Amino acid sequence: MLPSRYRLRRSSDFKAVLRRGRRVAGRYIVVYLSTSDTDRPGPQAGFVVGRNVGGAVVRNRIRRRLRHIVAARLAVIPARKRIVVRALPAAAAASFAELAAEFDRLLGRLTQTKNSQGTS
């Protein structure tokens, strides 16, 4: 379970991350990352699972899986960052392992520094 202090709750917070954040997309999810305006010490995460993903049972299952994936990786997410994870319709058919692997890959792409992207 993702502790409440690490969750994004207000729609204005979601909108700020979606507007100002960097974005990378995969087959199952889209991850947005932005710097927090507040002085909270840890990262915050929010989840968007729209009706195009499936019915209520499917959407809630995907949301629970995504929350569990992010909660297990709180130590890896940089402090004072906000993340929004948006599920795509293909996420309904994805396994937990596929969602976790894709989140790790996309988060890695977002958190790379410009120095590590240079040529050797």
Curated annotation (Swiss-Prot):
The keyword Hydrolase applies. One of its GO terms (molecular function) is 3'-tRNA processing endoribonuclease activity. GO terms for biological process: tRNA 5'-leader removal. Keywords: Endonuclease, Hydrolase, Nuclease, RNA-binding, tRNA processing. The keyword Zinc does not apply. It comes from the Bacteria. It catalyses: Endonucleolytic cleavage of RNA, removing 5'-extranucleotides from tRNA precursor. It is an enzyme of class 3 (hydrolase). Transmembrane segments: none annotated. Its EC number is 3.1.26.5. GO terms for cellular component: ribonuclease P complex. Consists of a catalytic RNA component (M1 or rnpB) and a protein subunit. PANTHER family: RIBONUCLEASE P PROTEIN COMPONENT. RNaseP catalyzes the removal of the 5'-leader sequence from pre-tRNA to produce the mature 5'-terminus. It can also cleave other RNA substrates such as 4.5S RNA. The protein component plays an auxiliary but essential role in vivo by binding to the 5'-leader sequence and broadening the substrate specificity of the ribozyme. Belongs to the RnpA family. This is Ribonuclease P protein component.
